[in-house]
């Protein structure tokens, strides 16, 4: 990939198998493009969204998503092998030699801070607070069993317990995945890269969160909240739009790759016994199921903003991007999480009073629990009120513009 001496080139380096990791740098890239800054994407999976916005996308090796998310879903602390990390670093370096970027903008590429150091490149990363060492809330709340009547959650003792929780979970995770710190030591990195911070930036980290949703502690100056980055999908409404709404209300279901076998078949049967209307974005996971006019509408992909605007409630897997998208529309949420990140997100949803969590196993054993949760959340006014309050907080941010401002500034700083 040739480059003139006058041009400025960004390598956008997401984990291309996951839409959230792909869409966040895309939003920043669109803003950078307006400023005449060249952006080239890299990924194993070619993206229609990237190409629709006239960006070039070059191929690079990535971990197999089935294996990677399988390990994460099964709670394996060693989520990737040492050999895989080495293979990814080599792929990174070969990519840099091909593209000749001035700066690497990563999202979900956990070898990027190491490879950018080796190559002598500036590196900015997009990440959620939950994947940093500065998170104020434990990822796995191991002390939640302590009764609130014994230790109040507002007191100083509980704050010390949470700090201990954070220290222990990070130490255990970093020990299980020592390969990152071993590379850091061997290369003499100024910042020790660990399993906890491997998704953050070597030079700057963009936090795609708001502090009211995910607070931090002792945040350094090269970390900055920019607000959520949610892609506005340019997808035309289906022929049946708008949906016929029954008296039970309109529910939008979007589950990504759920990890729940036969999820939409269960939903299809469940909704027919209610007065609800469901619009579902299936990601192609429906087999031979079809829509039933006025009851359930199934589409592979939908304009989520369009549907959420009409909906009373959003049911999702607890993914960070979907939660923020729902809150941007002031809609309460029911989450059915299957991986630790999603469970972490849904604990915040419950803590903020904007929704409820249903356990994956609980849903599979007794699907009616979803109907009960829908009735409870839609029938309790405070959930919608809290969701609208969160909307007003999120509205203060323009993540794409803020992220682009920082990336552009980093191009001029060494």
How should each PLM-predicted stretch be described?
Residues 2-156, 266, 279-306, 310-330, ...:
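Glycosyltransferase specificity loop/lid
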Residues 3-4, 199-200, 244-245:
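Short, flexible hinge/linker loops that cap or flank conserved catalytic cores
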Residues 14, 75-81, 96, 176-181, ...:
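Short, basic, glycine/proline-bearing loop/turn elements
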Residues 29, 209-313:
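Donor-nucleotide binding loops and adjacent catalytic segments primarily
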Residues 53-55, 60-67, 203-219:
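Short, compositionally biased "basic patch" segments
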Residues 86-88, 106, 185-191, 231-236, ...:
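Short gly/ser/thr-rich secondary-structure transition/capping motifs
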Residues 124-215:
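Active-site-proximal region of nucleotide-activated glycan assembly enzymes
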């Amino acid at each position: 990939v040739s480059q003139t001496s006058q041009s400025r080139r960004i390598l956008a380096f997401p984990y291309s198998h996951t839409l959230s990791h792909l869409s966040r740098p895309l939003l920043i890239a669109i803003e950078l493009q307006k400023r005449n800054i060249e952006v080239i994407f890299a990924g194993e999976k070619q993206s229609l969204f990237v190409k629709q916005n006239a960006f070039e996308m070059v191929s690079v090796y990535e971990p197999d998503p089935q294996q990677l998310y399988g390990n994460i879903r099964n709670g394996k602390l060693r989520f990737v092998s040492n050999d895989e990390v080495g293979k990814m670093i080599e792929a990174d370096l070969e990519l840099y030699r091909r593209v000749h970027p001035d700066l690497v903008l990563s999202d979900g590429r956990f070898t990027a801070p190491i490879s950018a150091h080796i190559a002598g490149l500036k590196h900015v990363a997009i990440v959620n607070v939950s994947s940093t060492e500065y998170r104020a809330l434990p990822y796995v709340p191991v002390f939640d069993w302590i009764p609130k009547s014994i230790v109040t959650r507002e007191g100083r003792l509980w704050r010390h317990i949470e700090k201990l929780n954070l220290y222990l979970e990070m130490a255990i995770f970093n020990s299980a995945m020592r390969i990152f710190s071993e590379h850091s030591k061997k290369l003499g990195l100024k910042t020790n890269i660990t399993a906890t911070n491997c998704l953050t930036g070597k030079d700057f980290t963009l936090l795609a969160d708001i502090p009211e949703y995910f607070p931090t502690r002792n945040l350094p100056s090269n970390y900055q909240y920019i607000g959520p980055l949610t892609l506005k999908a340019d997808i035309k409404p289906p022929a049946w739009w708008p949906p016929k709404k029954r008296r039970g209300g309109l529910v939008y279901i979007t589950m990504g790759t759920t990890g729940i076998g036969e999820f939409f078949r269960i939903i299809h049967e469940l909704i027919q016994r209610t007065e609800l209307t469901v619009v579902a974005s299936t990601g192609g996971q429906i087999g031979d199921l079809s829509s039933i006019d006025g009851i359930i509408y199934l589409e592979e992909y939908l304009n989520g903003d369009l549907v959420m605007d009409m909906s009373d409630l959003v049911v999702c897997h607890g993914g960070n991007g979907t939660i923020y998208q729902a809150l941007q529309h002031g809609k309460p949420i029911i989450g059915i999480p299957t991986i630790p990140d999603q469970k972490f997100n849904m604990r915040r949803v419950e803590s903020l009073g904007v929704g409820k969590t249903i356990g994956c196993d609980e849903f599979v054993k007794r699907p009616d629990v979803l109907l009960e949760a829908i009735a409870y959340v839609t029938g309790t006014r405070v959930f919608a009120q809290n969701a609208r309050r969160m909307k007003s907080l999120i509205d203060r941010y323009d993540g794409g513009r803020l992220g682009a401002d920082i990336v552009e500034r980093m191009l001029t700083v060494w």
